[in-house]
Design a protein with these regions (language model features):
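Membrane-integral, polyisoprenol-dependent glycosyltransferases
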Residues: 1-287, 291-301, 313-425, 432-436, ...
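Transmembrane-lumen/periplasm boundary regions of multi-pass, lipid-linked membrane glycan transferases
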Residues: 28, 66-70, 75-79, 226-354, ...
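Structural recognition of the beta-strand scaffold that forms the well-ordered cores
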Residues: 124, 181-183, 223, 288, ...
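Helix N-cap/beta->alpha junction signal
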Residues: 165, 491, 629-630
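Alpha-helical scaffolding within the catalytic cores
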Residues: 273, 281, 655-664
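Hydrophobic alpha-helix feature that most strongly marks membrane-spanning transmembrane helices
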Residues: 335, 355, 386, 402, ...
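Transmembrane helical bundles and short interhelical boundary loops of multi-pass, membrane-embedded
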Residues: 417-518
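Aromatic/acidic, Gly/Pro-rich catalytic loop(s) in extracytoplasmic/lumenal soluble domains
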Residues: 504, 585-589, 599-605, 610-624, ...
Length: 718
């Protein structure tokens, strides 16, 4: 069998003859290795503490954030069955439209600390700290051969970039599944790199487990990094080809088992004794995987929750993400979320590979570039060309890859600064970052108008200093230029990320940036919009093509019952719902008592009146009420602390049937029916079944007005 020398990245794992003894594990944790500069490990801890402070500070400002997922977490604190399935309500009528892994973490936090805004979002913020640490650890290992200082500085830069990405600052303080998704994918990257020095089966199996649970977080999106991880292990693992193949097989089995156990459990569970699988057309998880959360996202199409609806001012099929194409990630919709350092990352990838040249395929630095580059290219291309519904906040999944490339490629170019390609590469990264930062900051010209000029001028002067440093007598200018250029290059993205953390984000479509700004076209930038805007499906009085998904979907117009138009879906994109023709659409709702509600019905400004709250809270029925649509039901659940039946779920699911609803009413399981207007009106529930239920209720029960809402008491027929 072919043998390999112990790589630099793993030499500390074995005692070297004559080498000084290693510090105890606790000392290494806080001080690093003996040969590390004294400031390196404290710098890491400073970065992690700073990330924790920024992401935890005023965490409750957003209330319950996305009420759709918040209601599911509340349900999980009351019912272990709801916890397991990811039910929207504690009486287990229907699930959310995603697998429940992210809910499990938040439910456990809420069970320990009590259900509140802080306990809901605490795990999300801590996942940011974990992601920063994992990116640091991954980059440091791939750069170890460059020397401990260069490796650690590159790793610190990568970790900082993750924390300073606006999309990360948004989603790691929000209750959507994306925070856990990013953490798990990053854990998979770290495990893959740990597996390389000796072709470890244990570490590559852990990578498979991480991606398996990423699948249970957001299904197929969690597997977009799989090609990069597989190629890196196959090419760079320091073991025989046979053992590499076996290792990949073990990883595949680990992935399937860790992802499939829940799918199998749901499939084997009698359908009549579990909640309906939200987002599916046939009450199965597989339909959710390959339809609503699968091909529907890629190819679009109506009748599928992943499909796009009307796009208003945008291009058909773009649904909040802008038109498809290579420039989508740089468009106003997505650019402010993720693209601040994207040009620099692409430069780092190309020139980094040039710098490593023809080294052995197992070279750790090359492996790092391939891992992060494969992650960025595959995921970025899918996001750029998918025709189904996509939202700008999805791009948070690119943050670790961009950070990894900037840290790895930047360190390689710095190490090669005595060569022309190293100096020109560093200058190019800084110059393009400064120029693109100016463009992005210019999207909000009234916000800190001086900042974009500081970024541009400072960055270009720094790049010029690096070029001037090519003169032998001015080599110190390279160091000064790199340090200053890094500072100016990170200023724009850091400022925008910090501004994002100071703004309340509630409802279904959060957005990055300072108060009053929005990254989506529907919030004021050109070329944007999603369904529900004038000229698109879901305008006033209409419905969004009969389907909306909890992550995206399109909007519905208001029905006659006074419901506001819904935003996008629970995974949506902008911090404030675009104002609709009837004037509704504030994203930051409060209840009558002034408490944050996590975004009113549909992410709009509607709230539950105290009269309706008291009425439903006093009900002892299995479901205090039934209402069309998951977002309407979610807000009622949060306000009344009761289980509410969401007719039609989020995307016009065929549940319940009229016969099932009538049977539950006859059994006294549903206390009230709260009207959402003609044909549904609330998010989801716009199906013919929902209309039939509403017509049947109106024909057999007396309508009363409670707090401005039409309510039917289902305990007394007319």
């Amino acid at each position: 069998m072919t043998t390999y020398p112990i790589p630099v990245t793993d030499r500390h794992d074995r005692a070297q003859p004559g080498a000084p003894t290693r510090r105890p594990a606790a000392a290494r944790l806080f001080l690093g290795e003996r040969e590390d500069a004294r400031w390196l490990r404290p710098a890491l801890w400073a970065l992690l503490v700073a990330t924790a402070v920024v992401y935890l500070w005023d965490l409750g400002i957003s209330g319950y954030a996305n009420s759709f997922y918040a209601a599911a977490v509340q349900a999980g604190t009351k019912s272990w069955e709801a916890f397991f399935f990811g039910s929207l309500d504690s009486s287990n009528f229907i699930t959310v439209d995603k697998p429940p892994a992210s809910l499990w973490v938040m439910v456990l936090s809420a069970r320990v600390f009590g259900f509140s805004s802080f306990s809901l979002l605490l795990p999300q913020a801590l996942m940011a700290v974990g992601s920063v640490a994992l990116v640091w650890g991954t980059v440091r290992r791939t750069l170890a051969r460059l020397g401990t200082t260069t490796a650690n500085v590159g790793a610190l830069l990568a970790g900082f970039v993750v924390a300073a990405t606006p999309a990360a600052a948004l989603m790691f303080r929000f209750d959507n599944p994306d925070a856990l998704l990013v953490l798990l994918m990053t854990a998979g990257a770290y495990s893959t790199v740990r597996a390389l020095p000796r072709g470890s089966w244990r570490w590559i199996a852990l990578a498979g487990v991480a991606l398996g649970f990423a699948f249970l977080t957001k299904m197929l999106q969690g597997l977009l990094v799989l090609p990069a991880f597989g190629i890196v292990y196959l090419v760079a693992a320091r073991t025989s080809w046979a053992r590499r193949a076996i290792g990949l097989g073990i990883a595949a089995v680990s992935l399937v088992v860790s992802a499939g156990w829940w799918v199998v459990a749901v499939a084997l569970w009698p359908a009549e004794s579990r909640p309906y699988i939200g987002g599916s057309t046939d009450d199965t998880v597989l339909d959710l995987v390959f339809g609503y959360n699968g091909l529907g996202r890629i190819v679009g199409g109506s009748g599928n929750g992943g499909g796009g609806g009307g796009t208003g001012g945008g291009t058909a099929g773009s649904s909040f993400g802008g038109s498809t194409g290579l420039n989508r990630l740089f468009s106003s919709e997505m650019g402010l979320e993720i693209s601040w350092l994207l040009p620099a990352a692409l430069i780092a990838l190309v020139l980094g590979l040039v710098v490593v040249g023809r080294r052995h395929l197992a070279d750790p630095a090359r492996a790092g570039l391939v891992l992060w580059g494969g992650w960025l290219l595959v995921t970025g291309l899918v996001f750029s060309f998918m025709s189904g519904t996509i939202h700008p906040y999805y791009t948070v999944a690119l943050a670790p890859a961009i950070a990894g490339l900037v840290g790895t490629g930047g360190a390689l170019l710095w190490h090669a600064r005595e060569r022309l390609i190293g100096r020109l590469g560093l200058a190019a990264m800084i110059a393009v970052t400064a120029s693109w930062g100016w463009c992005l900051l210019n999207e909000n010209p009234s916000w800190l108008p001086w900042l974009r000029w500081v970024v541009l001028v400072g960055g270009l002067l720094s790049a010029a200093a690096i070029v001037v440093g090519s003169v032998p007598t001015l080599r110190k200018a390279v160091t000064v230029g790199v340090l200053a250029g890094t500072l100016f290059g990170l200023t724009g993205t850091t400022a925008y990320a910090l501004a994002t953390t100071t703004v309340a984000h509630s409802g279904s479509i959060p957005s990055v940036g300072p108060a009053g700004s929005g990254s989506g076209g529907a919030a004021g930038f050109p070329g944007g919009g999603g369904g529900g805007q004038p000229g698109g499906a879901g305008g006033p009085g209409g419905s969004a093509d009969g389907s909306q998904d909890g992550a995206d979907g399109t909007q519905q117009g208001p029905g006659s019952g006074g419901q506001p138009p819904t935003g996008s879906a629970p995974d949506g994109t902008t911090g404030e719902v675009p104002t609709m023709p009837d004037g509704s659409g504030s994203g930051d709702a409060t209840s009558e008592d002034g408490a944050p509600t996590g975004g009113g019905t549909g992410g709009g400004g509607a709230t539950t009146s105290s009269a309706l709250t008291k009425l439903l809270a006093a009900s002892d029925a299995k479901w205090s009420a039934a209402v069309n649509g998951s977002q309407s039901a979610a807000q009622l659940e949060l306000d009344t602390d009761t289980a509410v039946m969401a007719i039609g779920g989020w995307s016009s699911d065929p549940a319940p049937t009229l016969a099932e609803f009538q049977a539950w009413v006859a059994a006294g399981d549903i206390g009230y029916y709260v009207s959402s207007g003609s044909g549904g009106g609330g998010t989801g529930g716009g199906s013919s079944t929902a209309s039939a239920i509403q017509e049947w209720v109106a024909a057999h029960y007396e309508a009363t007005s409670v707090g401005g809402r039409t309510v039917y008491d289902l305990s007394a027929t007319t």
